[in-house]
Each structure stands twice: as structure tokens, then as C-alpha cells.
From Swiss-Prot:
Superkingdom of source: Eukaryota
BP terms from Gene Ontology: CENP-A containing chromatin assembly; DNA replication-dependent chromatin assembly
Gene Ontology cellular component list: nucleoplasm
Regions that span the bilayer: none
Positions occupied by motif Nuclear localization signal: 444-451, 465-471
Gene name in the database record: HGV2
Segments forming a coiled coil: none
Organism: Halocynthia roretzi
Name this protein carries in UniProt: Protein HGV2
UniProt feature, compositional bias: Low complexity: 204-217, 398-411
Keywords: Developmental protein, Nucleus, Repeat, TPR repeat
Compositional bias segments (type: Basic and acidic residues): 111-129, 142-199, 459-471
Length: 510
């Protein structure tokens, strides 16, 4: 029995030691992760919080309350790392020199061109190249089935013949020396080729296997692992999990504040992903919780107001953006006034010197933030004015429920300007001369003359013309006679001297 109790005590002591070690490791990981997060070393912070999450979930369970803080900070560090990656490659290209391309081109030129070589070396290189080209031609002919063993034997026998013919003239000696040089260069080139051939054969052997390996590598690259999740997606999952766990467990003030912080970070994530409606919803929920828990001069309220104004401006809801920017400005100005009052009240108190220094530092930070918010407000006002100008411009396309002129709502019978014709001819108007029908008398059939009319003599026609002339002369003579009668009457009255006027004068005298 004594031995059993000793064994049990030893087992419990080992368990306590392991638990203590795990807790220490968790605390170390959390402390190191928070430090890295403050120092903007987000990759190290991600590693530390990831290890802490695995240890806590293994000890307490994945849905335990003890895991909430680790989940939250793990999500925040992932969000910051994703921002760094998305921000034009972050700061990864800061230490990279800008003239890498020029350096590569210079190296390539050095490989292919050597402008500082002397003439002797250039001549040697030319001879070697020519010899190599000749050997290449021979090799190609051998591959085609043209044996050249006889020529090779002759080339090998040339140095022997040159040794025997040492007594010949200088010209022949020069030629023999050149032949020796050429043969030596050819042999060197052949030796190099023989040494290179097994390498080439090893590279060229089994083309099918190499092709399959290349295709398999491409397929592996194209096929994405299902476990490979982006940092942004993983950050969203961890923040959502932390929010749910904080809501599920003890509803204390600190937990509520952490729920608000989870909503704030989820809203920032929505802005990064350009999901502005989701970001606005998270910011509004955060604001509701913060208004209940925080004082009116808290900087967290100003941060939430600012983020809401930013999200509304992205959605082109400029009135809401102005409202929240202005509220953020009011919070900051109220906090500056409060801090100035505290500084004045604690002035001269040596015990609160540190507090005064921190308060003065915060006032300086807030005074730097206020101009930024004022510039945001000015930008929103300008954007709103431009939008109003576009709404009233005649070139803007009319939306539904608007008239094309922009003067208000249009009726159902109205049409936009683009569909109204410029001029329309009324149906009752006189037709245009171009459209009027031409003379069609030539198309009308004329009545054929009767045979009696065709047989009439020409004399009847002459008689008719004479009758017409007689009638004209009679009318003329009748008119002339009437004029003559009138003149005769007047002459008679004048010659007789009897007129009506003298008789009337005589009657008056009587």
C-alpha cells in the first residue's frame, strides 16, 4: 500500500509540473506576442499567438473562456500581417536596390562580350571557334551516315609527316605548324565534347519521365491545398470566434469591451476587403456598446466615429460621413479641453509629474489628429458639392423617377431627351413639293376620234375660223360705233348752244 501511495504521489507531482510548465509557456508566448505586436513585428507575433492558441486549446478545450484573449490577439496580428502584405508588398522592397536590372544586363554583356581582349587572344579564339565549327560539321555528317575515318587518319598522320620533312623549306614548315595547331585544337575540342556528351545524354535521357515530372509539378502548383487559407480569412475566423466566446461567457464589463473591440477589428477587416456594408454594421454595433460603457471623452469613441465616417464616404453617403467625422472631432476637442483642465489643476504637484507629462504628450498627439479630421471633412464637402453638380447637369443620364432636364419628377408620358425627336411633321400639313406627283397626263388614255370626225373636210374647219374672226371684228366695230354716238350727242349739244345750265340761270333771274 505504501508503494502504491508513493506511485500516485509521483504521478500527481509530474502532472502538476507539466501543467505549471504549460502555463509558463503560455504566459511567455502571450507576452512575447504582445511585445512583437507593439513593435510591429507581425510575423513573429503571429507565431507566438499561434503557439499560445494551440497550448490553450489543448489544455482547456477549443471553446473555453481562457482561449478568448489568445484568439483575439491572434486575429489582430493576422489582420495586421495581411495589411502589410496587401499594402503594395508592404515594406518588403525597402532594401532592394533599384538598379538590379542594369546589373543583370551588365553581367550578361560580360559573359558574351569581352571588349578589352588583345588581338592575339582574339585570333586564338577565332581559330578555336573555326575548329569547333569544323568538328561540328563532321559530327553532323557522321550522324547522317557519312563516315570520315579516312580523313581522321590523314589528320592524325600529318604530325608524323611533318617530323620526317624537317629539311623542307620554311614555307612548308609554316604550313605544317599550322596543321599541328589545328589538329591539337581539334583534339582538345573533341575531348571536351566527349566529356560533355554523357552529361547531355543524362540530361536528355528519359524525356517522358521529365515531361511527366514537369507536368506533375505544374499540376501541384495549380492545385491549391484546402488547408492553405489566406491571412485575411484566418483573421476573420479568429475574430469571429473570439467575439462569440466573449458573448457566450461571463457578461462582465471587460468582456463587453472586448466584444466591442472584436466588432471594431471586424469592421477594419471589412474596409480592407472593401465590404463596406458589413464594415458599417460592425462599427455601429461597436459604437452602441462603447456608448454604454465609455465616457464621452474617450478616444476609442473618436476612433469608431472616424472609421464610420470613412466607411460612409466609401459608400458615397456623404451626409452620414459628415455627421460621424464631426462627432469624432467633437470628442477629440472635448478630450483636449479635459486634459488641459487636468494639467492646470495638477500644476505644481510633484507627486503627479508623470501624469502631467503623459497628459501633455496626449494633448500634442490629439492636436496633430484634429487637422487630419478637418481635412477629411473638407474632402467630403467637396465630394458632396461635385455630386450635386452632377445631379443638376443636363449631361447626366436621367435616372428612374427623374425628368431629363433635372427639374423634378417626370410623368409617365414624358420621355427622356435622348428619345424626343427634334421635329415632327404633322399629318395634316401640306406635302412637300419633292413628294408631290408629277404630270401623269401622258399616262391617261385619250378618246379615239370617231370616223365621222376624221372624214370632215378641211373647209368646215376653215369656216369655223372665219366665223370666229367675223365675231371679233363685229365686237370691235360695235364698240367703235358706240363711242361715235356718244361723241355725236355731245357735239350736237355744243353746236346748238342749248344746254341745261343756261335755262336754269334764266329761271333764277325771273
Amino acid at each position: 500500500m505504501v508503494q502504491d501511495t508513493e506511485v500516485v504521489e509521483a504521478g500527481t507531482s509530474k502532472e502538476t509540473e507539466t501543467t505549471v510548465d504549460v502555463e509558463k509557456e503560455i504566459q511567455e508566448c502571450m507576452g512575447a506576442g504582445k511585445k512583437d505586436l507593439l513593435c510591429n513585428d507581425y510575423s513573429e507575433a503571429v507565431n507566438c499567438f499561434q503557439e499560445a492558441c494551440t497550448l490553450l486549446s489543448g489544455k482547456h478545450g477549443q471553446m473555453a473562456e481562457e482561449c478568448c484573449e489568445a484568439y483575439y490577439y491572434y486575429g489582430v496580428s493576422l489582420l495586421e500581417l495581411a495589411r502589410l502584405e496587401n499594402g503594395v508588398l508592404g515594406n518588403a522592397l525597402k532594401g532592394v536596390p533599384e538598379e538590379d536590372a542594369d546589373g543583370d544586363s551588365d553581367q550578361e554583356q560580360e559573359q558574351f562580350e569581352k571588349p578589352d581582349l588583345p588581338e592575339t587572344e582574339r585570333e586564338k579564339l577565332r581559330e578555336e571557334v573555326e575548329a569547333a565549327m569544323a568538328t561540328e560539321d563532321e559530327d553532323t555528317q557522321e550522324e547522317r551516315g557519312c563516315p570520315r575515318r579516312v580523313e581522321k587518319k590523314k589528320e592524325d598522320d600529318k604530325p608524323k609527316e611533318s617530323e620526317k620533312s624537317a629539311e623542307k623549306s620554311d614555307e612548308k614548315e609554316k604550313e605544317e605548324k599550322q596543321a599541328k595547331v589545328e589538329s591539337s585544337t581539334v583534339k582538345d575540342v573533341k575531348d571536351e565534347k566527349s566529356s560533355d556528351k554523357p552529361v547531355e545524354s543524362s540530361n536528355t535521357e528519359e524525356p517522358g519521365t521529365s515531361g511527366t515530372s514537369a507536368s506533375s509539378s505544374k499540376e501541384n502548383e495549380s492545385e491549391e491545398d484546402p488547408d492553405d487559407i489566406s491571412n485575411m480569412q484566418l483573421a476573420w475566423e479568429m475574430l469571429e470566434l473570439a467575439k462569440v466566446l466573449y458573448k457566450k461567457h461571463d457578461k462582465s464589463k471587460t468582456n463587453k469591451q472586448m466584444v466591442a473591440q472584436c466588432h471594431l477589428k471586424l469592421g477594419e477587416l471589412g474596409l480592407e476587403v472593401e465590404n463596406h456594408p458589413q464594415a458599417i454594421g460592425d462599427f455601429l454595433e461597436c459604437l452602441v456598446i462603447q456608448k454604454d460603457l465609455l465616457p464621452e471623452t474617450d478616444r476609442k469613441l473618436a476612433e469608431t466615429y472616424y472609421n464610420l465616417g470613412l466607411a460612409y464616404s466609401f459608400e458615397k453617403r456623404y451626409d452620414n460621413a459628415l455627421e460621424h467625422y464631426q462627432s469624432a472631432l467633437d470628442v477629440l476637442e472635448a478630450r483636449v479641453d479635459m486634459l488641459n483642465e487636468l494639467i492646470e489643476s495638477n500644476e505644481g504637484n510633484k507627486e503627479k509629474e508623470k501624469e502631467i507629462i503623459s497628459e501633455c504628450k496626449e494633448v500634442g498627439e490629439l492636436k496633430e489628429l484634429i487637422p487630419d479630421i478637418n481635412s477629411k471633412i473638407e474632402d467630403v464637402i467637396l465630394a458632396k458639392k461635385q455630386m450635386q453638380k452632377l445631379d443638376g447637369s443636363p449631361f447626366r443620364q436621367a435616372s428612374e423617377g427623374e425628368s431629363s432636364s433635372g427639374l423634378g419628377a417626370s410623368t409617365s408620358d414624358d420621355k427622356p431627351c435622348s428619345t424626343i425627336p427634334i421635329r415632327k411633321v404633322a399629318p395634316t400639313s401640306v406635302p412637300v413639293a419633292k413628294d408631290s406627283p408629277s404630270d401623269i397626263t401622258h399616262l391617261v388614255r385619250r378618246k379615239r376620234p370617231s370616223p365621222d370626225e376624221d372624214n370632215q373636210p378641211a373647209e368646215s374647219k376653215e369656216n369655223e375660223s372665219k366665223k370666229a374672226k367675223q365675231e371679233e371684228t363685229e365686237e370691235a366695230t360695235n364698240g367703235h360705233s358706240a363711242v361715235k354716238k356718244d361723241t355725236d350727242v355731245t357735239d350736237k349739244n355744243g353746236t346748238n348752244g342749248h344746254s341745261k345750265t343756261p335755262k336754269k340761270d334764266a329761271a333764277k333771274r325771273r
